[in-house]
Amino acid sequence: MLRLVVVVMLAVMAQLPPLSPARSTAPVPNDPDDPAIWINAADPEKSLVFATDKMPATGGLYVFRLDGTLKKAITPLDRPNNVDVEYGFSVGGRPIDIAVVTERLKHRLRVYGIAADGEVRDLAPSGLAVLTGQPALANEPMGIALYKRPRDGAVFAIVAPKTGGTTNYLWQYRLGGTNGALTATLVRRFGAFSQLGPVPGEIGEIEAVVVDDALGYVYYSDERYGIRKYHADPDHADAAKQLAVLGRDVYQGDREGLAIYAMPDGAGYLVSSDQLPGATRLMIYPRNGSARGPHDQPLLAAIPTGADETDGLDVTSTPLSGFPNGLLAMMNSTPRNFLLFSWTTVAAKLP
């Protein structure tokens, strides 16, 4: 019966007009990939959208205002793939917000501090080496998610390489600092991978990773299989245990971007992109599970958009100017930009 309900829901939603963005950013020069929203706690209207242009050698990290205009371009970077932000990372005993980028062809992370006024500076010009000792492609970092552990404020980076084996695909590093120099210390490897690709015999990949800091879960997209869920804390007694696999069916394209729309008391949504040419769909799941348990997270909606072949996306529930219930940012491939949607329009499509 549940399967029938889902099929009927998808058929109805497929007939709906696609969501219209409230705004769009200026284009990046080459090849957009992943956005990350930074909230300015002192002045939310001055919040920013960080976004990658993943061109080899001449790529960059682009910083946009909420009206879509460019504030800053950090170039050149050598195929910067994905970006994430975290708040209150301790550097020299002082908290600072950070944006961390995977610089794929340099096999490292780039870490940028975000001042209270939104100014951005490089905290580790030489970068932080990751995936050391791995063969070609397996030593290229693509996906990244940052996790701030609630009990002690420790900050971790969870990194997904370009390729890997069927186990221990993800690498988790604790970020720290010694005598003013940043460090990335490997604390664990974890995560199953189906190796399913777009065609038989071709190995796929894992790129999208997101952490729900408050609830302590990490999700990642095994692109042709499903969305896998684990505990984010490397010290958890069940850290190696897979908790659930979401989205095993109904996707028409790759399972790509992931983001958490977080509300108080664990409410909210896990948002995933179903990557399609000119018609990427938003796949929405309950953040806190169902009456059956926290890891029972059935598909709630498949919402059509006009975004083109979306890789990365991000979302916030913080009210912002023009976005009273929060903001959703989606990569838009052919126009080489990022679309900014009001969450109000998304919520209107939810059951």
Predicted regions: what is each one?
Residues A22-G59, N81:
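Beta-strand-rich domains and repeat architectures in extracellular enzymes and scaffolds
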Residues D31-E45, N82-P95, A138-V155, V199-G216, ...:
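Structural signature of eukaryotic scaffold interfaces centered on beta-propeller domains
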Residues N40-A42, G88-V91, V111-D122, P150, ...:
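Short loop/turn segments immediately following beta-strands, especially the blade-tip
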Residues L66-H107, L128-A129:
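Blade-loop segments of beta-propeller domains
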Residues L105-V155, V159-T163:
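Asp-box/WD-like beta-propeller blade repeats and closely related beta-sheet repeat scaffolds
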Residues A244-G257, R292-L320:
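Conserved blade-ending motifs and adjacent loop-strand segments that build the rim/top face
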Residues V250-P298:
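Loop/turn-rich, solvent-exposed surfaces of beta-rich toroidal or solenoidal domains
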Residues G312-P351:
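Blade-level signature of beta-propeller repeat domains, shared across WD40, Kelch, NHL, RCC1
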